[in-house]
Amino acid sequence: MEMLISIITVVLNREATVEDTLRSVLAQTYPHIECIVVDGGSVDNTVSAIEKYVSLFEGRLKYISEADSGVYEAMNKGLRMATGDVVGYLNSDDVFKDRHVIETIAQTFEQPEIDAVFGNVLYRRRNGERLLRRYSGSHFNPGMLPYGIMPPHPSFYARKSCYIKSGGFNTNFRIAGDYELFLRFFQKERICYRYLDLDVVVMRFGGISNRSFYSVLCGNSIELMKACRINGIYTNWLMLFSRFFMKVGGVIRWLIVPHYIWRK
């Protein structure tokens, strides 16, 4: 039996971008994809945009539209709806880098010992084609988690059994629920993972976790500290703030090497 991959998109009032996201999923060369959209009760034309794609997916798209308490409750809803062997999340204003991304990911999961894979994420301007930076997962190891460093979540795919075993996302977090889940995956469950040198997703810069200077400098660190504490993992403010110097280094590397224009 072919491996089914569930791609979950959480959306709220994204009529301007959600169609790009759905087209990106529809264009994938890997045929065994289940697309799940969890709408949080949009008041614009988001649901109408989603409904236009139901027939195009030929039974492979499921969606729900109802109010929720936040993004992580919505992500858990999508997880419960998923019937795939492997699960990944694609933000409602992001797209896959190319048509072959999921095919490459599926090939890696043919190795039964692999629990999860992740690659790289590209950032571009919200209303432009120029790429701003590349967030690579190549240097990640679980020992970096207490420093606030984690794999790029939009590039992360894991077996659904891992999510079930860990209990899914902790809805008490506003912006660090993915980090807290990674603490459980890598530090407690000790999942077997593989880094792929693959640009998985192109993100529009400005999501909830990097929208403002305050959230980057203060809000994120407060939640990261809380996540470590509830999981019994030692960290401190100095360790968490050191990640900003690492991020600056990544930006500098991006600025001094040739980069390019991304086109859909």
Residue ranges and their predicted role:
Residues 1-213:
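Nucleotide-sugar donor-binding/catalytic module of glycosyltransferases
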Residues 177, 220, 240-244:
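Short, conserved alpha-helical segments within structured domains
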Residues 198, 211-238:
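Catalytic core of nucleotide-sugar-dependent glycosyltransferases
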